[in-house]
Amino acid sequence: MARCIPSACSKALLGASLLLGPAQANPWQQARFPVPQFSGYTSHYGLRTGASGGSSLHRGLDIAAPLGSPVLSWWAGRVERLINDGSCGIGVAIRSGPYEHLYCHLQGTIEQDTLRSGGASLRQGSWLRTGEPLGAIGVSGRSSGPHLHWGVKLNERWLDPVLLLRAMADARRVETPISQARP
């Protein structure tokens, strides 16, 4: 598993600043949690045991939310590919510099090279801003209930999305003025 401590990931992000937008003192402030209406995490990154008893590497974080809830782009980037298969179901992969972020189990359809989900319409090569809706929570593919499977690669290596969420939370804590901090 690739480690993504804030300093290491920040360097990778700053190195891709032309694609990702203007550099900031803390680039993690630009990132956005992909499921604003989430209700919990149902499966974490790492080894897990399946119903058949075998173990496999789960390359992402499963985020439960009500069916049809919006899914947002974690970071600005280009749609690299649209996915429609038995595992991911309806999904999209977005390229943001050294990062590829994957969104699976979306509601909707892919027809004529266009993903239509939750009011969003995406084609390969489309540009998305950080926080822009890219689809809606669904149950497509291998899914036992409504959720988003969110996978992230850094320089083509899978990493634990929880590390990104921690870096985002740390960035926001650093920037919260003391007068706004809760006791």
Regions found by a protein language model. Give the residues of each.
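Surface-exposed, glycine-biased beta-strand/turn segments
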Residues: 23-91, 96-97, 129-130, 139, ...
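Bacterial N-terminal signal peptides that target proteins for export
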Residues: 2-13
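Bacterial N-terminal signal peptides
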Residues: 11-21
